[in-house]
Amino acid sequence: MAASVFYSRLLAAATLRSHRPRTALPAAAQVLGSSGLFNNHGVQIQHQQQRNLSLHEYLSMELLQEAGVSIPKGHVAKSPDEAYAIAKKLGSKDVVIKAQVLAGGRGKGTFESGLKGGVKIVFSPEEAKAVSSQMIGKKLFTKQTGEKGRICNQVLVCERRYPRREYYFAITMERSFQGPVLIGSSHGGVNIEDVAAETPEAIVKEPIDIVEGIKKEQAVRLAQKMGFPASIVDSAAENMIKLYDPFLKYDATMVEINPMVEDSDGAVLCMDAKINFDSNSAYRQKKIFDLQDWTQEDERDKDAAKADLNYIGLDGNIGCLVNGAGLAMATMDIIKLHGGTPANFLDVGGGATVHQVTEAFKLITSDKKVLSILVNIFGGIMRCDVIAQGIVMAVKDLEIKIPIVVRLQGTRVDDAKALIADSGLKILACDDLDEAAKMVVKLSEIVTLAKQAQVDVKFQLPI
């Protein structure tokens, strides 16, 4: 496949499915966004199939601890009683309770229990229990979760530290550097995207030689540029070098620390961690991928992963089934050009089977907002007749009652057209992509107008 989806996904400004700005694009990625890796849908394109697995903060912190990185003391609690016990064991006069949800903006979020904020400072084990009881088992709503929120199944209970200064640090993959790059800033504990937009000179970058790794002098140079005091530059550099270990060892695409701090004792600590992992490495990173929390994902994401499909739900009403991420985004663009709104991004890849095509239709039609479907296939490796078989099977098995416009070109296209013609189904064929897009937009508009007028309109298939 020439390209595919990078799963951390879409900017909140994009027409993202309401419950999931799917974690908006990682901050490190947005800092490097000027390299042209993002299209206007907010989807990042790679030269190979790549999806990112994100882990909860407490799991990421455990990986850092294994690497010898300095972090605050803390443990995960899955019940209020466990939170009480951990807070008591820490023996600190004040501790921090951090909701574990895979979404940004938790500090300003609201729980369905009414609790404001997903990060709370408490001053006794009893208060830790009371606060965690309002988090665990409750949904947290943030700008990134949308109206459906995200369930909080556990909280991280950790000691409170008092930072003198806060910094931002990340290691991420960057095409323009042809490998990993270190990113640092003296502006930590804030949205690094805002820093990149308002004061880009405050962000420093250091490319890493993928063969030699991080050199000590390189890490020291970055720490100095970030503004660490001379007395702790070496300590900061050591932590940076140690952070590269899990990045390399676990096939990470990003390790982000925000903030990395100098605390009141003069120690360098990583107070928070976000790590993304390349899903192409799942076959050799079973330990990591077994940690995936599917309760944080939409059911359609889980179904798509099982069928090895690249799917992202959006807010529109025109379903899209396409092979290849580049063609999929071009399809969304042309739908938008003609006044329509895509309901999804769905790339079936270059080697899709009849089963995968059927599963793709199940994903599309499970979204009740979808009023019409555009299938756009250019058969190179992908055979058009396989797609046609899947379409016919899906329409029959799923009893699809909404209009389907199919544009097929390439390998075995004549066989595909014959299969569709012989099926007896009212599947609208179109050779020209522009005409196909116009047609599917018009059909969605007809259904939309009918619904607004409270007129019951059904497309009966077969006719």
UniProtKB/Swiss-Prot annotation:
<keyword id="KW-0547">Nucleotide-binding</keyword>
<feature type="modified residue" description="N6-acetyllysine">
    <location>
        <position position="129"/>
    </location>
</feature>
<dbReference type="Pfam" id="PF08442">
    <property type="entry name" value="ATP-grasp_2"/>
</dbReference>
<feature type="site" description="Important for substrate specificity">
    <location>
        <position position="94"/>
    </location>
</feature>
<feature type="modified residue" description="N6-acetyllysine">
    <location>
        <position position="139"/>
    </location>
</feature>
<feature type="modified residue" description="N6-acetyllysine">
    <location>
        <position position="143"/>
    </location>
</feature>
<feature type="binding site">
    <location>
        <position position="98"/>
    </location>
    <ligand>
        <name>ATP</name>
    </ligand>
</feature>
<feature type="binding site">
    <location>
        <position position="272"/>
    </location>
    <ligand>
        <name>Mg(2+)</name>
    </ligand>
</feature>
<keyword id="KW-0067">ATP-binding</keyword>
<keyword id="KW-0460">Magnesium</keyword>
<dbReference type="InterPro" id="IPR017866">
    <property type="entry name" value="Succ-CoA_synthase_bsu_CS"/>
</dbReference>
<feature type="modified residue" description="Phosphoserine">
    <location>
        <position position="279"/>
    </location>
</feature>
<feature type="binding site">
    <location>
        <begin position="105"/>
        <end position="107"/>
    </location>
    <ligand>
        <name>ATP</name>
    </ligand>
</feature>
<feature type="modified residue" description="N6-succinyllysine; alternate">
    <location>
        <position position="88"/>
    </location>
</feature>
<feature type="modified residue" description="N6-acetyllysine; alternate">
    <location>
        <position position="88"/>
    </location>
</feature>
<dbReference type="GO" id="GO:0042709">
    <property type="term" value="C:succinate-CoA ligase complex"/>
</dbReference>
<keyword id="KW-0007">Acetylation</keyword>
<keyword id="KW-0809">Transit peptide</keyword>
<comment type="pathway">
    <text>Carbohydrate metabolism; tricarboxylic acid cycle; succinate from succinyl-CoA (ligase route): step 1/1.</text>
</comment>
<comment type="similarity">
    <text>Belongs to the succinate/malate CoA ligase beta subunit family. ATP-specific subunit beta subfamily.</text>
</comment>
<feature type="modified residue" description="Phosphothreonine">
    <location>
        <position position="341"/>
    </location>
</feature>
<protein>
    <recommendedName>
        <fullName>Succinate--CoA ligase [ADP-forming] subunit beta, mitochondrial</fullName>
        <ecNumber>6.2.1.5</ecNumber>
    </recommendedName>
</protein>
<dbReference type="InterPro" id="IPR005811">
    <property type="entry name" value="SUCC_ACL_C"/>
</dbReference>
<feature type="modified residue" description="N6-acetyllysine">
    <location>
        <position position="78"/>
    </location>
</feature>
<keyword id="KW-0816">Tricarboxylic acid cycle</keyword>
<feature type="modified residue" description="N6-acetyllysine">
    <location>
        <position position="368"/>
    </location>
</feature>
<keyword id="KW-0479">Metal-binding</keyword>
<dbReference type="InterPro" id="IPR013650">
    <property type="entry name" value="ATP-grasp_succ-CoA_synth-type"/>
</dbReference>
<keyword id="KW-0597">Phosphoprotein</keyword>
<dbReference type="InterPro" id="IPR005809">
    <property type="entry name" value="Succ_CoA_ligase-like_bsu"/>
</dbReference>
<keyword id="KW-0436">Ligase</keyword>
<feature type="modified residue" description="N6-acetyllysine">
    <location>
        <position position="216"/>
    </location>
</feature>
<dbReference type="GO" id="GO:0004775">
    <property type="term" value="F:succinate-CoA ligase (ADP-forming) activity"/>
</dbReference>
<dbReference type="GO" id="GO:0006104">
    <property type="term" value="P:succinyl-CoA metabolic process"/>
</dbReference>
<dbReference type="GO" id="GO:0005739">
    <property type="term" value="C:mitochondrion"/>
</dbReference>
<comment type="subunit">
    <text>Heterodimer of an alpha and a beta subunit. The beta subunit determines specificity for ATP. Interacts with ALAS2.</text>
</comment>
<dbReference type="Pfam" id="PF00549">
    <property type="entry name" value="Ligase_CoA"/>
</dbReference>
<dbReference type="InterPro" id="IPR016102">
    <property type="entry name" value="Succinyl-CoA_synth-like"/>
</dbReference>
<keyword id="KW-0496">Mitochondrion</keyword>
<dbReference type="InterPro" id="IPR013815">
    <property type="entry name" value="ATP_grasp_subdomain_1"/>
</dbReference>
<feature type="transit peptide" description="Mitochondrion">
    <location>
        <begin position="1"/>
        <end position="53"/>
    </location>
</feature>
<dbReference type="InterPro" id="IPR034723">
    <property type="entry name" value="Succ_CoA_betaA_euk"/>
</dbReference>
